[in-house]
Structures are given as structure tokens and as C-alpha cells.
Amino acid sequence: MSSRTHANGKINPMEIVDAGRFLPAADGTARYVEQLRVPALSAGTYSIPAGAADNQEPHAEDEIYVVVSGRASFTAGGRTIDAVPGTTLFVPAAEDHRFHDVTEDLTLLVFFAPAYSGDPD
């Protein structure tokens, strides 16, 4: 049983998450770190260093990105926009999408619904 679940099997009403891991991988590549997972959703942090590639594939889940810091372009559904702090992006399940032209280290909050079914690490 995880710390997110009471002995009665119900999910705790509140979870405090140490989300201080906004660092890219040691080799300078993009890094996703899952911070929270319950059946209905998962949340994590995604860091892409300036100049690095975003090599993710489409997911089976709906996804929301919130840009915390940095600057990049984002393409999905045939549209490209500037991704800057405060930008919130919704990507439907199975939609091809990508961050590119990362000119400043990019840090994002990421939410999947239902919970991400891929390998979170």
C-alpha cells in the first residue's frame, strides 16, 4: 500500500509532493520525473535543456503541460506556438506533439489523465 492510500483502500484527500526535481538528466538530455500517480491521473516534472531534443512519442493519455520557466516552440495538431512561462497546453491522447527550438532551459509541470501508462523513468 502506498502512502497515498489509507488502510481502508481510499486515496488520501491531499498529497504533498516534493517536486524539486526540475533538473535535466546528467547527460544533458530531457528528463521526465513522475511526482504523483493515482488511477485517474499522474503528474510530473519535465526538463529540457536549451538546445536538447524532445524525443517523446504520442501517449495513450490526454496531457496538460504548464510551462514554469524557459522558452521553446511547441507543435501539435499542425500548429506551432511559443511556449513561455505561464503557457498551458492541452494535448489529446495519441496526438503527435513536440517541444523544439528550446532556446532557454525549459521546465514544465505535466499532467496525464488517466495516469500515464508508459515507463515514467
PLM features: residue spans?
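A short, N-terminal "cap"/entry segment at the start of jelly-roll beta-barrel domains
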Residues: M1-T45, N55, P120-D121
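Short, conserved beta-strand element in jelly-roll/cupin
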Residues: S47-I48, P58-F74
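Structural motif
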Residues: I64, R71-S73, T80, D96, ...
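Ligand-binding loop in jelly-roll beta-barrel domains
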Residues: A93-G118
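Short acidic-glycine-tyrosine-enriched beta hairpin
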Residues: G78-A93
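Short strand-coil-strand connectors
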Residues: P39, T75-R79, V102
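Short, charged/polar surface micro-motifs in flexible loops or helix N-caps
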Residues: P39-L41, P49-A53, R71, P114-S117
